[in-house]
Amino acid sequence: MNNYKKPFLIAEIGCNHMGQLEIAKDLINLAKMSGASVAKFQKRDNIKLLSKEQYNSPHPNPNNSYGKTYGEHREFLEFSIDIHKDLKLYCEELGIDYATSVWDIISAREVISLDPKFIKVPSACNNNEELLKVLRDEYQGEVHISVGMTNKLEEEKIISLFENNKSAKERLVIYSCTSGYPVPFKDICLMEISRLQEEYGNRVKNIGFSGHHLGIAVDMAAFTLGANIIERHFTKDRTWKGTDHAASLEPNGLLKLSRDLNAVYESLSYKEEEILEIEKEQRLKLKFKSN
């Protein structure tokens, strides 16, 4: 019997659409064809998020910038809520779920109006208590939260905040994550999945894994450790301009990840009988027979 939950694969498109709606829709289509369950984006209010100094400063990596300043760069990559509504409708037409990470309260309330199945909070914002309260109190769907660059006291505050209205067990999903782009294998720390399962598994709905690493081998191990929700950044071309493309999977990589996760899921079981049906004929032909 297989007690593992079925793999749930999230294609994190994020800002890899490069500010172009047609590329975003193309990536949704490719994510669906590659076996993803969700096409996920991001929503930010850059004026609220960035200080005036940050907004007007140059991008730290000018080769990846889409504007003269970091603020202009972020605005270029930002979709309006009307475009997000269009993307959600397109996802529904294709039969793939739409989801979005939100970075601030304004964005959270805008995305809540679209009523997606879940809304995600990135590691950078998981200590924004007011943001978490808005998602807890004004939204009925699942709230997914990454805990990269987060200490145990901060983790406990997140769980407790949702337990305060008894919604953690029904609605809260916590993701093991290391915040880096890309993350070297030694810093992925997969055993954190086991720790999160042991400490919070009976207090939250589920434990996931958000990976910023290269390749797909690590994701197989993450799944076997109990993280059936796997999130990976997704792009059409890893050489495209932007900071996230290099740590993303291309369609062929996502397709292989989906294939391999499902293969591992199907194989994780005990034998239902001592000699399986597939073995019986081989046993008759090959098993040593004593005189």
Show where each model-derived region lies.
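Catalytic cores and adjacent flexible loops of soluble metabolic enzymes
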Residues: M1-N291
